[in-house]
Regions:
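Extracytoplasmic gate region of multi-pass secondary transporters
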Residues: 1-4, 188-231, 235-238
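Small-residue (Gly/Pro/Ala) motifs that create kinks and tight helix-helix packing interfaces
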Residues: 4, 36, 113-126, 212
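Residue-level signature of mid-helix packing/kink "hotspots" within the transmembrane helices
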Residues: 25-34, 115, 234-238
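Conserved MFS/SLC helix-loop-helix module at the cytosolic interface between two early adjacent transmembrane helices
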Residues: 31-70
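Short hydrophobic/alpha-helical segments at membrane-entry points of transmembrane helices
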Residues: 68-76, 192-193
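Cytoplasmic helix-loop-helix junction between adjacent transmembrane helices
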Residues: 75-111
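Symmetry-related core transmembrane helices of the 12-TM Major Facilitator Superfamily/SLC fold
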Residues: 133-154
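Juxtamembrane intracellular "pre-TM" segments in multi-pass secondary transporters
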Residues: 156, 160-194
Length: 238
């Protein structure tokens, strides 16, 4: 969203087409999130995290190399798929093996990452007038993170002993199973939590997608400044 005011003119599409990309990413995220339980039991939280980070890194690099709207839409599919599983897998892993304060730190790190992205994009637009460079810079960071996660894979099995081995794929068939959605819907308070999370996600995604465009087209702020200002929202929720 932070780069869209600079992107849409190059693609020759209406400003509203950002919504198409967002919906494709959201659809992929929902699908991979719903499948995350089964995938994590089969592969383990560490491998799911590594694959997801690598997938999003490749997709971001693809964004940075693309100059076609429809190609961006195509690349948005693996980006969404990679973004969904990692959230569910990491949250579940931390909830099982760490204290609640560690969950807060996990979400804090997400907020920092989400805040840094628009700032990097703003700098790329300001210095190079090139949104593509911003995506490439972010993809390079993701690639480094991929290597870090891959190197740390042996550590995932050390936390929690046998309990962790089950969550990381070993002996999963004996100790864990994927919970069907119909069972999840029977959990007391689950529907209220889903509704609250839906409302939060709607606000977060709408603001993240359109904040930069609003600042450019309504407030007349330069694109590079608006891209950086979009980070303030994520800083606020962090």
């Amino acid at each position: 969203g932070s780069a869209w005011p600079s992107m849409y003119t190059e693609f020759g599409v209406p400003v509203s087409y950002a919504g198409i990309i967002s919906m494709i990413i959201a659809l992929g995220t929902v699908i991979s999130s719903l499948m995350s339980d089964r995938i994590t039991i089969k592969l383990g939280a560490g491998r799911v995290t590594a694959i997801s980070v690598a997938t999003t890194a490749a997709a971001l690099l693809g964004f940075g190399l693309s100059h076609s709207f429809w190609l961006i839409c195509l690349i948005a599919i693996p980006y969404g798929l990679g973004a969904g599983s990692i959230d569910a897998a990491l949250n579940n892993y931390v909830a099982l093996h760490y204290a609640s304060r560690h969950m807060s730190w996990l979400h804090c790190m997400w907020g920092i990452g989400a805040s840094v992205g628009p700032c990097i994009m703003g700098l790329a637009i300001a210095h190079n007038n090139n949104w593509s460079a911003g995506y490439r810079y972010i993809s390079y960071i993701q690639i480094v993170l991929t290597f870090i996660v891959v190197i740390s894979l042996p550590l995932w099995k050390k936390r929690g002993g046998a309990k962790d081995e089950a969550s990381d794929g070993a002996c999963a068939s004996e100790t864990a199973r994927a919970v069907p959605l119909r069972e999840i819907f029977r959990i007391p308070g689950e529907k209220a939590i889903m509704l609250a999370f839906f409302c939060y996600s709607a606000i977060e995604q709408t603001t993240g997608l359109w904040a930069s465009s609003y600042l450019v087209f309504v407030k007349g702020i330069p694109a590079q400044t608006a891209a950086s200002f979009a980070a303030l929202f994520y800083i606020g929720i962090t």
